[in-house]
Design a protein with these regions (language model features):
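Cyclophilin-like peptidyl-prolyl cis-trans isomerases
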Residues: 1-252
Length: 252
């Protein structure tokens, strides 16, 4: 018998948000439940709010933080391995996703231990989604080419040191060709499914975050509270001018 996805209730100073955590992302599910039971989230703030994008919380230094304090760096000293269940789970409006540090220091896209965001996003047109697919395909091709360069680094360096420019050009063209062929084979990875397209066109979300951050739950009640938080006034650092507090997180 299939075990039901666990439900948590996030009590905030603006109202309650009911969230389903996915059993398909057990590392994130268990980590969130553990922190909730320990009271880690009690008193923390939604410290970063961007209209038509998301609301973010979980900075462990945000509790009772002065209104002028810069927030966003507070965490628990460990990360949670990425759990991409794509395209089943994506950044539709109401998705619960894990914050993380950037690719340059975190190429594995591991998640923050405590920081999360809830997607608000916006509605997209077919033309905009088509353009995003092209951009995703270009990024995939570049990623593949970079990997091939790394795999052939010693040969490239030898040709470069020996001044063999023609051979270097031939090798580069060969790697570009291989990258294009692999991209063509993996084209489906950058295509939106019919379900994604329909939701992004009707309810909205943030499609360019897909396969970049781990989605591990979704709001099932209280989306109006999420929207209320999304629309508060913020300062130049996207911090609300009046503190929005997570008073507690209840399991079930």
């Amino acid at each position: 018998m299939e075990i039901q996805d666990p439900i948590i209730v996030m009590h905030t100073s603006l109202g309650n948000i009911r969230i389903k955590l996915y059993n398909d992302t057990p590392l994130h599910r268990d980590n969130f439940i553990k922190l909730a039971k320990e009271g880690t989230y009690n008193g923390l703030l939604f410290h970063r709010v961007i209209k038509e994008f998301m609301i973010q919380g979980g900075d462990v230094t945000s509790k009772d933080a002065p209104i002028n304090k810069q927030l966003g760096a507070g965490d628990l000293g460990y990360t949670v391995p990425a759990e991409f269940i794509y395209p089943r789970y994506f950044h539709k409006k109401g998705a619960l996703s894990a914050a993380r540090t950037g690719d340059e220091v975190n190429p594995e896209k591991a998640s923050s231990a405590s920081q999360f965001f809830i997607v608000t996003g916006k509605v997209y047109t077919d033309a905009e989604l088509n353009q995003m697919e092209k951009q995703k395909e270009a990024r995939l091709k570049q990623t593949i080419f970079n990997r091939l360069q790394t795999e052939n680094k010693s040969q490239i360096m030898n040709l470069y040191r020996n001044g063999e420019k023609d051979e270097l050009t031939i090798l580069k063209d060969t790697l570009i060709g291989k990258a294009e062929m692999e991209t063509e084979r993996r084209k489906d990875e950058v295509k939106f499914t019919p379900e994604q397209r329909e939701i992004y066109k009707s309810k909205g979300g943030v499609p360019f975050l897909d396969n970049e951050y781990t989605v591990y739950g979704e709001v099932i009640e209280g989306l109006d509270i999420v929207e209320k938080i999304e629309n508060v006034k913020t300062n130049s650092s996207d911090r609300p001018l009046e503190n929005i507090v997570i008073t507690s997180v209840e399991i079930g």
